[in-house]
Amino acid sequence: MSRLPPQTRDQLQPAQQDLHDHFNDAVRRAVGKDPGNVDTASHQDSSQAAIGGPFPFLSVLPSIGRLSLDMIAGLGQVLPDFPPDARETASLVCTSYYKSDYATSAHTKIARSAAMLTDAQIEAITSATRPTDLNHRCIVAYDAAFHLLHVRGALPQDLWDRCLLAFGKEGTVGLVH
């Protein structure tokens, strides 16, 4: 049971309704126009037309929620060439580390539906194990995300250099975010 259950749009205050619309627009831009992808990414329950996932939390303070959403969405907009499979690899490392069932489920569905990662790779990543059959970019993304979460502190120089080679400076900074 969520501490902040999803509400339908008509149950929200005007500022929350604006954020609701902005959230849905951001999800559509991020995952495309396929309604299945939008439902997956926003965890929208079409039977009650309420958005779950992070939205109830973001909507408590709509102006701060918008800033948080815009920062996350902005990374995708300024890094359009960041490899999607590496992005989903890093996302799964993070969501599983923080035990965010919603986000892990959403990123699993995105990675699976676009054939970015295999089921075995997803299972390993979400179990804090680096799959042996990842491509080079996914290995670098996994190693960087894993280091930042489990070891903490600055990336070691060799890992930083691997990130720069794989993703460039902007991509590396985006990955660290």
What label would you give each PLM region?
Residues 1-82:
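Secretory/endomembrane lumenal or extracellular ectodomains immediately following the signal peptide
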Residues 44-47, 80-86, 133-138, 166-171:
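Structural motif
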Residues 49-59, 83-97, 173-177:
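Alpha-helical scaffold segments that form or flank carboxylate-/histidine-based iron centers
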Residues 58-68, 94-101, 141, 145-152:
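Alpha-helical transition-metal enzyme core signature, strongest for iron centers
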Residues 64-67, 88-119:
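Conserved alpha-helical segments that form or flank metal/cofactor-binding pockets of metalloenzymes
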Residues 65-80, 122-127, 156-165:
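Short amphipathic alpha-helical segments and their helix-coil junctions
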Residues 114-146:
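A contiguous pocket-lining binding segment that forms or flanks enzyme active sites
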Residues 135-176:
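Acidic/histidine-rich alpha-helical segments that form the ligand environment
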